[in-house]
Every structure is written in structure tokens, then in C-alpha cells.
Curated annotation (Swiss-Prot):
Protein name: Uncharacterized Golgi apparatus membrane protein-like protein C34D4.4
GO biological process, one term: protein secretion
Keyword check for Membrane: yes
Subcellular localization, as worded in the UniProt entry: Membrane
Residue spans crossing the bilayer: 45-65, 119-139, 144-164
One GO CC term on file: Golgi membrane
InterPro entries (UniProt xref): TVP23-like
Organism name: Caenorhabditis elegans
Lipid bilayer topology: Multi-pass membrane protein
Length: 205
């Protein structure tokens, strides 16, 4: 995993006065990029859920959802990951025809606002979870054509999630070790909590 520097600055700069005014786009370090990160993802999910309100043609519905998913995939892979969290993954083919994958992270991660990073990872995780839910729902209701559409959405979202997880850790062994430690610490934390005392109900005549 090699480091890279990015001199592009898009969006407003967060100030203390802006953070004290409650929720607004200006509370983010790069509000325009945050909006781009969530807009196509949300639009694809919204149209999938309400597609029949816009058109009865499954072909049109499929093409619209596929277009939104493609725009979301490209935006997250090439823009929002680089500008919100300083991560980038890509691939190239060498002269011998071999495919090489690159997973990179910025050298100075303090340049990226904490709230921007949280929104980025939240959207990256919620997206695949929502599409997997739609896959299960379509399967249980025997709507197999919609299950295929939802499966396509899940795969495209999971591809970005996997790519950025690889950027976050040098290799799969480090990533697996991190989640194992996280699970162990959660189990240990729960085990250290004092047991709750159970009180029998008191009945009065």
C-alpha cells in the first residue's frame, strides 16, 4: 500500500461558528463531496423502492437503477474516497497482460475531517446492507427479477466496500486480525459487566 498526496480542496472549510448552529451541510469539511457520496446511493435505493410509481416498464426501471448504481460506483471509487478519507483503489494491466490492483492511502490523514470520514464509512456500510435486505425480501416474495436487480446493487456496493477496506489495511491478514481483536474486545467488555440482579415480583393480597 503506497501513500499519495492530494492537493485538491473541494467544498467549504468547517469553522467553529458553523458547528454550533446545529445540523447543516456546512458542518462538514467538504459538504459538496459528502452530498455526492450519498446522493446517487440514496437515489438508487429510492427508485428501487418506488419504481412502480414512475413507470410500469421493468426494462426502464432496470436501466434507471443500473445507471444510478453505475454513477454511485464511479463517484465513490474515483472521487469521494479520495477526497473524504484519503483512500484510493485502482488497477492497471501491464505489458504482459497481467492485472495489478493498487490500494493506497494518503500520508497525512489529519487533513480529512472526522465527520466526513464517519459519513463516508457509514454510507459505504449501509449501502450493501440495504441491498442485501432487498435481495432477501425479493427472494421471499418470489420476485426473482427484482432479486437480480438488488443483487447487482449489493455486488457493486460491496466491491467499493472491499476495495476501501483493503486500502485501510495493508493486506487481508491485517484486516482479519483487526476484526478478530474488535470482536474479542467486545466479548471481553460484555463479560466484565456486572450481572443484573433479578428481583422476584411481590404480590400483595
Amino acid at each position: 500500500m503506497s501513500g499519495f498526496e492530494n492537493d485538491i480542496s473541494i467544498g467549504a472549510t468547517m469553522t467553529q461558528s458553523q458547528t454550533s448552529q446545529g445540523f447543516s451541510l456546512q458542518m462538514f469539511g467538504k459538504p459538496t463531496i459528502v452530498l455526492a457520496h450519498l446522493s446517487f446511493k440514496g437515489a438508487a435505493l429510492f427508485f428501487y423502492f418506488f419504481a412502480n410509481f414512475f413507470t410500469n416498464s421493468f426494462i426502464v426501471q432496470f436501466l434507471v437503477i443500473l445507471t444510478l448504481l453505475s454513477m454511485d460506483f464511479w463517484t465513490v471509487k474515483n472521487i469521494t474516497g479520495r477526497l473524504l478519507v484519503g483512500l484510493r483503489w485502482w488497477n492497471f494491466v501491464d505489458a504482459d497482460g497481467n492485472n495489478h490492483w493498487k490500494f493506497e492511502s494518503a500520508k497525512d490523514m489529519t487533513r480529512f475531517a472526522t465527520i466526513d470520514r464517519r459519513v463516508f464509512w457509514l454510507g459505504l456500510v449501509v449501502g450493501p446492507a440495504a441491498w442485501i435486505f432487498f435481495v432477501v425480501t425479493a427472494f421471499l416474495t418470489l420476485k426473482f427479477e427484482w432479486m437480480i436487480v438488488a443483487l447487482l446493487g449489493a455486488l457493486m456496493n460491496m466491491a467499493n466496500l472491499w476495495g476501501y477496506l483493503r486500502c485501510r489495511w495493508n493486506n487481508t491478514e491485517q484486516m482479519t486480525s483487526y476484526f478478530q481483536k474488535w470482536a474479542f474486545l467486545n466479548v471481553l467488555r460484555r463479560a466484565q459487566q456486572p450481572p443484573q440482579e433479578y428481583q422476584n415480583p411481590v404480590f400483595s393480597a
